[in-house]
């Protein structure tokens, strides 16, 4: 049975960038990695209602810059910036002797963001909404927003069934093996009374590299 590689990992260095942008020697690498993990978990847990899509971490000598991509920036920033100051103070306890800079980036189309779609489906499952309805509604909203294709999968004791299973729904195209295809991937878990249900979402937003190819062709023609 074929297993699918993570769409982001496959495309890093081709059309995707790293979520952690820093370099460290052997002595500090593990500490930085654990610190990153703690930061991501804390921000995600603390600002779950704000719809955090992803967190980029950049490091300099004594400085950490966080780029937080969120659907509802106002919920994180708070009234007069109080929320962001509170978040910064709490994060300061996790990272010692380092200055933290927080940059909030708004996700313009949350209905086309794979991570936010997965979390939305998971939240609906926790509210006992039928999984098929939750998946189909998310697919319809994503297709209306202009994506080229979307695929969703729910795994677990669906509708309280005795035997766990996986159900997929998709619309449009999802070229997983095409490296120039901009495929967004999201994963979330729903805690239901019957146990956990895993939600996976793949969103195809179109090809990324053709413009560069056309520029090269024009340069060759001019030469």
Curated annotation (Swiss-Prot):
Domain KH type-2 span(s) in chain numbering = 39-108
Alphabetical keyword list: Ribonucleoprotein, Ribosomal protein, RNA-binding, rRNA-binding
One Gene Ontology MF term: structural constituent of ribosome
| A Gene Ontology term for the protein's cellular component | cytosolic small ribosomal subunit
PROSITE patterns, sorted: KH_TYPE_2, RIBOSOMAL_S3
- Keyword Repeat part of the UniProt annotation: no
**SUPFAM superfamilies in the record, alphabetically?**
Prokaryotic type KH domain (KH-domain type II), Ribosomal protein S3 C-terminal domain
State any GO BP term from the record: translation
Give the Gene3D superfamilies listed for this entry: 3.30.300.20, Ribosomal protein S3, C-terminal domain
Q: Which domain of life is it from?
A: Bacteria
For the keyword rRNA-binding, the answer is: yes
* Family (UniProt): Belongs to the universal ribosomal protein uS3 family.
Its biological purpose is as follows: Binds the lower part of the 30S subunit head. Binds mRNA in the 70S ribosome, positioning it for translation.
UniProt subunit comment: Part of the 30S ribosomal subunit. Forms a tight complex with proteins S10 and S14.
- NCBIfam families the UniProt entry points to: rpsC_bact
Q: Which PANTHER family does the annotation name?
A: 30S/40S RIBOSOMAL PROTEIN S3, SMALL RIBOSOMAL SUBUNIT PROTEIN US3C
Sorted alphabetically, which HAMAP family does this protein's record hold? Ribosomal_uS3_B
Q: Tell me what this protein is called.
A: Small ribosomal subunit protein uS3
Q: Which organism is it from?
A: Clostridium botulinum (strain 657 / Type Ba4)
Query: Which gene name belongs to this protein?
Result: rpsC
């Amino acid at each position: 049975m074929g297993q699918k590689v993570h769409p982001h990992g496959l495309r890093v260095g081709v059309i995707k960038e790293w979520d952690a942008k820093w370099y460290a020697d052997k002595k500090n690498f593990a500490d930085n990695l654990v610190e990153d993990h703690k930061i991501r978990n804390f921000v995600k847990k603390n600002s779950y209602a704000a719809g955090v899509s992803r967190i980029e971490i950049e490091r300099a000598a004594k400085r950490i810059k966080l780029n937080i991509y969120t659907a509802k920036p106002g919920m994180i920033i708070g009234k007069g910036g109080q929320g962001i100051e509170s978040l910064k103070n709490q994060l300061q306890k996790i990272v010692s002797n380092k200055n933290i800079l927080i940059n909030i980036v708004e996700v313009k189309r949350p209905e086309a963001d794979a991570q936010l779609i997965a979390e939305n489906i998971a939240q609906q499952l926790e509210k006992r909404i039928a999984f098929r309805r939750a998946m189909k509604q998310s697919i319809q909203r994503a297709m209306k927003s202009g994506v080229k294709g979307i695929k969703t999968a729910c795994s677990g004791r669906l509708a309280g069934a005795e035997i766990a299973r996986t159900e997929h729904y998709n619309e449009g195209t999802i070229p997983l093996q095409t490296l120039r295809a901009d495929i967004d991937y999201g994963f979330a878990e729903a805690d239901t009374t019957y146990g956990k249900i895993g939600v996976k979402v793949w969103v195809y937003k179109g090809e990324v590299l053709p413009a560069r190819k056309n520029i090269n062709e024009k340069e060759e023609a001019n030469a």
